C-alpha cells in the first residue's frame, strides 16, 4: 500500500540519511552532549527559547527513525545499530545533565522543569503529531525535514535533561516522571513513523498475507508498550483534572 508517493531515488537518499544518522559515532555523542547542555541551561534559566535552540543540534530523533525503518523492513543490522545509538545517546544525556546539576549545586526548579515532571495524554498527542510531521517530511522531498526535526527533538532531549536535573535535586519521582515523558514520546514517534514508512511503500515487498504477519510479529512489543503507556497517561490526565477541580472547590 502506497498512500504517499516516494521515488526510488528519494528512498535511497532517505535510507542512507537514516542509516548514517543512526550510527553511534563520536560526532553523534558530541552533538548529544552539546544539545543536552544547552537544553539543561534552558530548563534551569526557565527559557523556552534556549530549550528550543538546543534542538537545532539534537541528533536523537534519527535513531528512532532508524528503529522504525528497521522494523518496517525487517533489517536486523540497522535495528541493532539504531538501538545502540539511541540507548547510548539517552544514557549520555541523562548522565550529562545529572553531572551538570550536581556541579551547579542547589538550584530552584523552574516552571520549565516542573512542567515536564507529570506527563499526560496531551503530551502523547503532541509527540504523535510531531512524529508524523518528521516522518512525512523525510518521505516528501518537497518538505524540509529541518523544522519537523526540531519539533521532534523538542520532545526527546528536554525530558532527558530534565530527568538528570531532577535527580541532581534529589527528586527521584520527578526524574522518573520526566523519563516517562521521554519514553512516551519515543514510543509515539516510533509507532507513527513506522506507519508513515509503511504507507510510503518503504516496507520490503512480500505477499500481502506474509507482509502483514511479519509486520505484526515485529511490532507486537512496541504497540503493546504504546497502548499501556497511553492508558497510563490517560489516567494521569484524569487525576490532574480531578485535582484541579478539588482545588477550585476548596477556593
Map each language-model feature to its residues.
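Small-residue-rich segments of transmembrane alpha-helices in multi-pass membrane proteins
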Residues: 87-97, 152-164, 217-223
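Cytosolic-side transmembrane helix boundary signature
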Residues: 190-219
